């Protein structure tokens, strides 16, 4: 897969790093590095990124970016999300390229 001009690093706002880290570790097995009170980096095995401290977090419904995560087993991933404290806002649906 070409890597030129592909998303290389992703930064997202978060108001509660511990909750964000706990959720993504449990639901998706992401690895985290703590860089102090204002930043927490992650790696999911394919992309690196981080969460920066912000009290002004938004949702896709309010104009924030919609990020699609790939999963081989959608039903199992849905169960992992729920068991990790996440909420399903839109159930599994057909998506272009999926």
Could you describe each region identified by the protein language model?
Residues 28-35, 87-91:
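Short secondary-structure junctions
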Residues 68-98:
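Vicinal oxygen chelate
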Residues 14, 44, 94:
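Conserved strand-loop elements at the edges of beta-sheets that form or border functional pockets
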Residues 23-24, 81:
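Conserved active-site tyrosine of GNAT-family acetyltransferases
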Residues 1-21, 48, 65-67:
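N-terminal beta-strand motif that seeds the catalytic metal site of vicinal oxygen chelate
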Residues 17, 32, 50-52, 64-71, ...:
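Residue-level hotspots at or immediately adjacent to binding/recognition sites across diverse folds
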Residues 30-62:
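Conserved short beta-strand elements that form part of the metal-binding/catalytic scaffold
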């Amino acid at each position: 897969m070409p890597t030129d001009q592909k998303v290389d690093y992703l930064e997202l706002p978060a108001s509660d790093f511990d909750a964000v880290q706990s959720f993504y570790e449990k639901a998706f097995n992401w690895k985290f590095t703590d860089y102090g009170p204002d930043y927490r980096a992650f790696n999911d095995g394919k992309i690196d990124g981080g969460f920066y401290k912000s009290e002004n977090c938004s949702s896709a419904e309010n104009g924030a970016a919609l990020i699609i995560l790939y999963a081989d087993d959608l039903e199992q991933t849905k169960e992992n999300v729920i068991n990790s404290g996440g909420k399903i806002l839109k159930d599994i649906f057909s998506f272009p390229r999926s």
